[in-house]
Design a protein with these regions (language model features):
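Short, Lys/Arg-enriched N-terminal segment that forms or immediately precedes the first helix
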Residues: 8-21
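Short, leucine-enriched amphipathic alpha-helices that occur as contiguous helical runs
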Residues: 10, 27-28
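Pre-recognition alpha-helix immediately N-terminal to the DNA-recognition helix
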Residues: 29-34
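Short capping segments at the starts of secondary-structure elements
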Residues: 37-43
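A short acidic, leucine-rich amphipathic alpha-helix
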Residues: 46-52, 63
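Basic amphipathic alpha-helical segments that dock to polyanions
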Residues: 63-73
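Non-DNA-binding regulatory cores of transcription-related proteins
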Residues: 72-156
Length: 156
């Protein structure tokens, strides 16, 4: 789980900045705080809306650059489906997988010990050692499936 204060994440970011000769900035700290507190996968536009409630002077380009920096520092990952990139915090998170709506891009996290057990069993059977993995299961969310069903009914 992401720490509630973001203290560890800020330390990771600070170390990354030092290693790459970059400066700390108040804007990056505000963006990191908002990103961690969002508690969900966010698009650039969503994060911009959250950040601008605190700092109206932070622009879209700064959000993009900060999210790239967070990715480079190992604090965020990017998922792009449905034509829109979404970002999620990575640091100190429990392992989880994703259902992703291919129509609207909404992302649903899930945990399944059963799936984890099955893949470990299969890996052992072929002499494979899993070091990391991600499951991204594409489909349609309830809303998009209902829209598609209604659209099909109207045509038919």
């Amino acid at each position: 789980m992401v720490s509630t204060t973001g203290r560890e994440e800020k330390q990771v970011l600070a170390a990354h900045l030092v290693r790459h000769g970059l400066k700390r900035s108040r804007q990056r700290e505000v963006i990191l705080d908002a990103f961690l507190k969002a508690g969900r996968h966010v698009s650039v536009e969503e994060l911009l809306g959250i950040v601008r409630r605190r700092r109206a002077d932070i622009g879209r380009t700064t959000i993009y650059r900060s999210l790239k920096l967070f990715k480079d520092a190992g604090l965020a990952s990017e998922l792009t489906y449905g034509g829109e990139a979404r970002f999620e915090p990575l640091w100190n998170r429990d392992h989880h997988d994703h259902f992703i709506c291919g129509s609207c891009g909404e992302i649903f996290e899930f945990k399944s010990p059963e799936i984890e057990h099955i893949q470990e069993k299969i890996a052992r059977g072929i002499g494979f050692r899993i070091e990391a993995h991600r499951h991204h299961i594409l489909g349609r969310c309830r809303k998009c499936a209902a829209k598609a069903s209604r659209a099909g009914t109207r045509r038919g």
